[in-house]
Amino acid sequence: MIRSKCSCHHHLLVLVMVVLWISPRYASAEDEHAKDFYIIYLGDRPDNTEETIKTHINLLSSLNISQEEAKERKVYSYTKAFNAFAAKLSPHEAKKMMEMEEVVSVSRNQYRKLHTTKSWDFVGLPLTAKRHLKAERDVIIGVLDTGITPDSESFLDHGLGPPPAKWKGSCGPYKNFTGCNNKIIGAKYFKHDGNVPAGEVRSPIDIDGHGTHTSSTVAGVLVANASLYGIANGTARGAVPSARLAMYKVCWARSGCADMDILAGFEAAIHDGVEIISISIGGPIADYSSDSISVGSFHAMRKGILTVASAGNDGPSSGTVTNHEPWILTVAASGIDRTFKSKIDLGNGKSFSGMGISMFSPKAKSYPLVSGVDAAKNTDDKYLARYCFSDSLDRKKVKGKVMVCRMGGGGVESTIKSYGGAGAIIVSDQYLDNAQIFMAPATSVNSSVGDIIYRYINSTRSASAVIQKTRQVTIPAPFVASFSSRGPNPGSIRLLKPDIAAPGIDILAAFTLKRSLTGLDGDTQFSKFTILSGTSMACPHVAGVAAYVKSFHPDWTPAAIKSAIITSAKPISRRVNKDAEFAYGGGQINPRRAASPGLVYDMDDISYVQFLCGEGYNATTLAPLVGTRSVSCSSIVPGLGHDSLNYPTIQLTLRSAKTSTLAVFRRRVTNVGPPSSVYTATVRAPKGVEITVEPQSLSFSKASQKRSFKVVVKAKQMTPGKIVSGLLVWKSPRHSVRSPIVIYSPTSD
């Protein structure tokens, strides 16, 4: 979820995290005795939990500490899905632990951030869509987030029977948590760093609202007349209203999302029996084996569980996409055909539209209009006053005025309101494609409009303006959100990321009453539903589609579900999205087509190991994923083709030293459509690129039959930084299976 480039959801989203492999160079004389939490990974899931926990204690005791101290230092033993533990160690102790024969890897625990109605109709999943309700009721979706609001209407269990027999999870009792029902069938929290700030509650209850919003988006029941103070009124619902939810609270509003808690959440979800995991969390770029979400999702994949994750909110900068593992379905954020704007009426008769949600009707026809610079306390404060920073403004010059402020941080309207101002016009070129909620009359305009307003102020001694209450506006869509993180994939030049785009702008969904709408001091706005934007909001849309597909095909692998979603996507116009597939992957989700894709590109865990070997991984770096140091790439049959992966998309990265590049991609598809089918290849090649497919026709005589083919791509050298788009479509009379082909020339090798 996002608020602004600077505030990032104010108190919650400023938290960042990176996993560091422990090495002697990271320790210094100053921190040698300082202790921090580390995750010590020992390998695959053990057979005997009790003996494994004893082993964890004994390993800690070997650091010349007592058994009692070892028990105090250990905060987690992971024994249900993999073998690991988390404990408080000094850098020297962590180094010694890494040298132990039993230990596969050691990583420092740090923190990640959250990537934070009409959208389902927009993507083609209306209430009338075909459903297998009996199977849908058996689908269990695990959400790793900030908790959930069990009293929300979105989580009523009317008409739902008891949880599926396969469910092994639990639900409290917990403090300040009313409990689960047949909709929310599981709820747990994870917090063992000893840091519980004031206002937090040790329970799965959501005091931030993020987890409630994402959970209701993926599987909320129908709630009629849902709105935000009358805005975006309609029926709120999730993709699969009959599916079950399990909440794993791994993020805390004031202290973030810890590695060790995220791993504990994954372990619990795997053990409990979820089938889809939705996680709208991310952090700085890391390699595939040193990232807690990567490791947790790999183990989930091995158990047949698909992890759907947000791509991140660091766009439009290139190479910023996170959660870019091939076994994760990585989601970009797109816009739907509505937005929210407020009209600004100037005293000279001119009017402009500002972006944002301001639910306040003006009490006067107009107010004096003043720039932040003109309201400065003194000359020395004028630079800071242009941003309307509180300490730089003269209260008397602000009171009763509409202020014009440059964007310099979040909560500008809070400052203006506290000074008695009548409103704020915020000038910014950041994220003007999504509507920020304001706690006072306010709206955002781009710098071009801002300059016109500044000129008006300077042209008269009696400038005036009024900000009207927000209204809903219809706009062209879909388009990729400016904030949505872009490729190319920083983890691999051979793998296209993100995978897919889904609505993530101005999404109405359930919220908590334990937090105001903005989270800013002085905000008195509370609502059971709110409008949020971010790849955090896009992620549960795709998780919901994955659950929808799962309800039709309970036996499909994570890779098959992922393939179905990517190859059935609706194309997004490259003309309005210059980053092309690096912005939206396969395109916009198309739920009903995803349930009947015709062909799928399937894979198992060995396929991903082959890919990693092709990426240069070795026994040591593979160990956190596969659970042992004994897996050697030299003993594994190499993956076929240029990318060693049976992926539903193709990416070729050119080398600047060559005048042309030729690559052969090997693929295999499985027939999941009519038993007797014939598919013919259609290729679209961009200028300067040759694409051939062999064979050009695939014939199937039965269901689940597999057919292999190769795609040969030959591309001339291009301008550094350029991306061109090709396409392979396998067509039958009933199905069209789309695979984007991306050719990219990096800015440097």
Swiss-Prot record:
Propeptide span(s): 29-115
First-level EC class: hydrolase
Protein origin, superkingdom: Eukaryota
EC number: 3.4.21.-
A single GO molecular function term of this UniProt record: serine-type endopeptidase activity
Cysteine-cysteine disulfides: none
Tissue localization of expression: Expressed only in roots, particularly in xylem.
Protein name listed in UniProt: Subtilisin-like protease SBT4.14
Lineage, top ranks: Eukaryota, Viridiplantae, Streptophyta, Embryophyta, Tracheophyta
Gene: SBT4.14
